[in-house]
From Swiss-Prot:
Compartment annotation: Cytoplasm
Family annotation (PANTHER family): UDP-N-ACETYLMURAMATE--L-ALANINE LIGASE, UDP-N-ACETYLMURAMATE--L-ALANINE LIGASE-RELATED
EC numbers for this chain: 6.3.2.8
Designated gene of the protein: murC
Name recorded for this polypeptide: UDP-N-acetylmuramate--L-alanine ligase
NCBIfam families: murC
HAMAP family assigned to the protein according to its UniProt record, in alphabetical order: MurC
Pathway terms, separated by semicolons: Cell wall biogenesis; peptidoglycan biosynthesis
Matches recorded under Pfam families: Mur_ligase (PF01225), Mur_ligase_C (PF02875), Mur_ligase_M (PF08245)
Residues spanning the signal sequence: none
One GO biological process term: peptidoglycan biosynthetic process
Organism in which the protein naturally occurs: Shigella boydii serotype 18 (strain CDC 3083-94 / BS512)
Keyword tags: ATP-binding, Cell cycle, Cell division, Cell shape, Cell wall biogenesis/degradation, Cytoplasm, Ligase, Nucleotide-binding, Peptidoglycan synthesis
A molecular-function term among this protein's GO annotations: ATP binding
Amino acid sequence: MNTQQLAKLRSIVPEMRRVRHIHFVGIGGAGMGGIAEVLANEGYQISGSDLAPNPVTQQLMNLGATIYFNHRPENVRDASVVVVSSAISADNPEIVAAHEARIPVIRRAEMLAELMRFRHGIAIAGTHGKTTTTAMVSSIYAEAGLDPTFVNGGLVKAAGVHARLGHGRYLIAEADESDASFLHLQPMVAIVTNIEADHMDTYQGDFENLKQTFINFLHNLPFYGRAVMCVDDPVIRELLPRVGRQTTTYGFSEDADVRVEDYQQIGPQGHFTLLRQDKEPMRVTLNAPGRHNALNAAAAVAVATEEGIDDEAILRALESFLGTGRRFDFLGEFPLEPVNGKSGTAMLVDDYGHHPTEVDATIKAARAGWPDKNLVMLFQPHRFTRTRDLYDDFANVLTQVDTLLMLEVYPAGEAPIPGADSRSLCRTIRGRGKIDPILVPDPAQVAEMLAPVLTGNDLILVQGAGNIGKIARSLAEIKLKPQTPEEEQHD
């Protein structure tokens, strides 16, 4: 970036001119790292800390950031401001040191709000679909030559990054409701994909509280802003009269302003028509499977149409859409002869979905695109509280696959809850009489326990939000083949 471009960018956020050094505690998270990446490209001195290196920290170090793989008071020395993720506790030594030194400590969303303040902000919220919809909107705006800045919770595969600094006036960002911090944002346009019970500890277990928080988020829009909302979702339909802002609805419903019809999935692509008010019908080829992704695309098209983006640019972006990391992420197709001696192959797909609705959507997309495949799922429940709160829903959804292998619950810092563990969930599913789940007690046993259930015409879904993504990549690296002790030692 040349000096003139940097000066222009620094003038966008005038209140931050006195800020020189920004320190992130928990910088390795996708959301934190994305904001740090944008600020690094704007010319700020960036430092941060986390417990272990990952691709996010490597990318930031490539940009000149200083990363500490520990949490120590001296890490915040000389920082102008400290940005903290919701996963970091108040007694973290860096947070304590910052307070003692009277260094401002702010949440991630507060910094995102500062980036958005002097740009045309587009915020994408909702229980499911935020990351993919953010990537779709970003792809359309980039295809239209608008050079947006985007900050996403997942890897935007076309760009190879979670976030990118553009020179245009648009900032497109995923808005996180998990800790209610999206209330800091004041966008011009807000998408709400759906609203379901999740992260209920943030909302005192009160669903009405969660719904009101989404209304409060939408009321952060200016009176001339616009809310784009999925009318197929029963909670959104209920809340629409309370929004108090201009709205555009989308969905398969007949009364949607942007309506999806004639949906058909062929392999990994969706084909459908979008009907828009006062516009010609748009026949879409979307390079992403599933009816849920058609809805995500409808939201993106609604925003782009409102902005006046040319239909041809919209269609090009959706047809060439490369998706996001860990969202129906195709990792390869592998011959089974070296794995278990059988002929044929197995496809390997990695997916982040960890709520029953998300898992259900992934299964439906797999069944629609590959109806003849033996559907094998390796599932890792995420959080004991979520497993407890949605136990019956998980049991119902997971019976839809042909074979289920289940890892232990990924705790995400939570203490175990009796009856909300993987062994109990397997027992409940087995009792329903449809499938016989296989409990995998040790991640190191995955390949060994997976091989015997593969038939030679398989689609393997590796599903969950914990460390299971690393397991998926490991399976791809070894091409599903169980490793001998000698091979493991060599690795």
